[in-house]
């Protein structure tokens, strides 16, 4: 997965799988928006809840402030949500 954080000009930070990018557009899938919780952590919610599942979305670059790599723990959580395969945690067993 090519997991990225996209900052929209509306202020939202959207975690996505980036499929393709051109000078004018980005093609993404599985967009989630990060939302702070009362416990100080970040939760995820759907960014485009009315879009058909597993369908890509095209976004104009004119709405994008920046694109960046997501933090490792964010990528791991994102992949757990969208991966059809359950992956074990990377902790050592003693």
Where are the regions a protein language model picked out?
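Conserved RNA-binding domains used in RNP assembly and mRNA/RNA metabolism
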Residues: 1-94
């Amino acid at each position: 997965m090519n997991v990225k954080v996209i900052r929209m000009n509306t202020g939202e930070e959207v975690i996505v799988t980036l499929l393709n990018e051109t000078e004018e557009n980005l093609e993404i899938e599985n967009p989630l928006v990060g939302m702070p919780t009362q416990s100080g952590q970040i939760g995820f919610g759907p960014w485009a809840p009315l879009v058909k599942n597993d369908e890509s979305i095209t976004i104009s670059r004119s709405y994008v402030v920046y694109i960046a790599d997501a933090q490792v723990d964010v990528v791991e959580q994102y992949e757990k949500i969208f991966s059809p395969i359950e992956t074990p945690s990377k902790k050592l067993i003693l």
